[in-house]
Amino acid sequence: MSKHELKDKKRKSVDGEDVSKSKKVKKDKKDKKDKKAKDGNDKVKDKKDKNKKDKSKTDKNLKEVQETEAHTGSETAPVGDSTAAAGYVESKELASVPQADVDTFFSENEVAVEDPESLGFRPLLSFSHLNLHSAIQKEISKFPKPTPIQAVSWPYLLAGKDVIGVAETGSGKTFAFGVPAINSLMSEKSTPRGVKCLVISPTRELASQIYDNLVQLTDKVGLNCCCVYGGVQKDSQREQLKKAQVVVATPGRLLDLIEEGSAKLAGVQYLVLDEADRMLEKGFEEDIKRIIKETKSDVRQTLMFTATWPKEVRELASTFMRAPVKVSIGNRDELSANKRITQVVEVIDPFKKEKRLLELLKQYQSGAKKNDKVLIFALYKKEASRVERNLKYNGYNVAAIHGDLSQQQRTQALSEFKAGTANLLLATDVAARGLDIPNVKTVINLTFPLTVEDYVHRIGRTGRAGATGVAHTLFTEQEKHLAGALVNVLNGAGQPVPEELMKFGTHTKRKEHNAYGAFYKNVDLTKKAKKITFD
């Protein structure tokens, strides 16, 4: 139909001519067909004009992909290839893995998956089973194989599902959420603008550690990553936020930046709550909810990683996650200690603890062990300061992290300990959760923590990433109300229970009600030990 005919038809319709419904439908279909044909001709012409310009660029990209495939042994794609950078398709190599091998993997690693949509993804037992952006594939291929939490969670995360990961610290959780998050950002044809990936962490030290790991990936793909936390000036953080696509933050400082308008989260596509149980313990629940409200649920994929799975964490997850897949590594519903850690509990007079500490340091740092890293836990910062001075007086090169130190001093202390400049680190519980300090051979609990949960998290600083370790605990009569709970943990990990500890009784304080007080249960040592469930 010509343009003049269309104009005439339109003019007649305006003048009041009655056009039947069936004719109008035919007309619309014909117009769409004509337009589609015209657009197709235009595209063919544009494509011919562009072919010569793009030929050299295409050849170059093809060469890069072929080189990467030769290096990693898997198919990869350049930036902007949505096949490799977004979504998940099981590889033929993974599909050919015998089911017996998959069953063995699940059994040996105590893996449990709650899959509400029954997707049934198989774990990625090798990096060659992945199809990621080439730079990311190359970076992670430096490691021997995916950790259990990575192997099981990656398929669901790459498929865009909300995921809850329940696993001990030191299990590779940062790359478990970092690799799919950054890979998904690379599916965009141009560099994304604004904050797209947000990781919330309970402490400054843990936030810095997560940042150090993620920047290994973001630097390789041309994205900007920044870390915001309290205790330092905001000016540099404001500037970094303007350019960052990936942000790691503590709740308090992030809320400050949101309220002043420096942090805008409406574009967040990937939200991660790391150490969620720890954040709730520290009273960040309302802060977390306020931060989440700044994001848009219809575009947000949400991840939660936690070492334990108490009622409070379950309730938080139910409020903002959509049909999440829950991946548990080990028996994380109940409190249990790493079985690779040798636990030694010594009942002692409280006034003899610091003298005994010096004896233990000679024991654990003698001969071939003189350079071994030892992490010492005190309960309060005043105690930590006093013990630090005493150790330095006795000639020990000790670093310390506790509340009386500035953020710069704490960061410096951690750096010295990681580098081996100082082989003793004295800490309060600020360092008990989440921090990945490699090669800690021994943990000494100079003063027992306020809860057995904190005890388990403290000793978890050793025996990480498949290694073994020793945890030596000085226990006094002042902590006798925790004796029963400690006995349960020792029995659950197959560790010896000293007779002196049994003298304090074997009741376990389960819960306390404002009106009815505490409820207790007795430990029957003739039966197989049951682990404690905190609800």
UniProtKB/Swiss-Prot annotation:
Positions annotated to bind ATP: 167-174
GO terms, biological process: endonucleolytic cleavage in ITS1 upstream of 5.8S rRNA from tricistronic rRNA transcript (SSU-rRNA, 5.8S rRNA, LSU-rRNA); rRNA processing
Gene Ontology CC entries for this record: nucleolus; preribosome, large subunit precursor
Helicase ATP-binding domain location: 154-327
Chain segments carrying region Disordered: 1-82
Biased composition (Basic and acidic residues): 1-21, 34-72
Intervals of motif DEAD box: 274-277
Swiss-Prot/TrEMBL catalytic activity: ATP + H2O = ADP + phosphate + H(+)
Ranges spanned by the short sequence motif Q motif, renumbered to the chain: 125-151
Gene3D superfamilies tied to this protein: P-loop containing nucleotide triphosphate hydrolases (3.40.50.300)
Helicase C-terminal domain mapped to chain residues: 352-505
Alphabetized SMART domains for the sequence: DEXDc, HELICc
Enzyme Commission number(s): 3.6.4.13
One Gene Ontology molecular-function label: RNA helicase activity
Function field: ATP-dependent RNA helicase required for 60S ribosomal subunit synthesis. Involved in efficient pre-rRNA processing, predominantly at site A3, which is necessary for the normal formation of 25S and 5.8S rRNAs.
PANTHER family from the UniProt entry: ATP-DEPENDENT RNA HELICASE DBP3
Protein name, UniProt field: ATP-dependent RNA helicase DBP3
Lineage: Eukaryota, Fungi, Dikarya, Ascomycota, Saccharomycotina
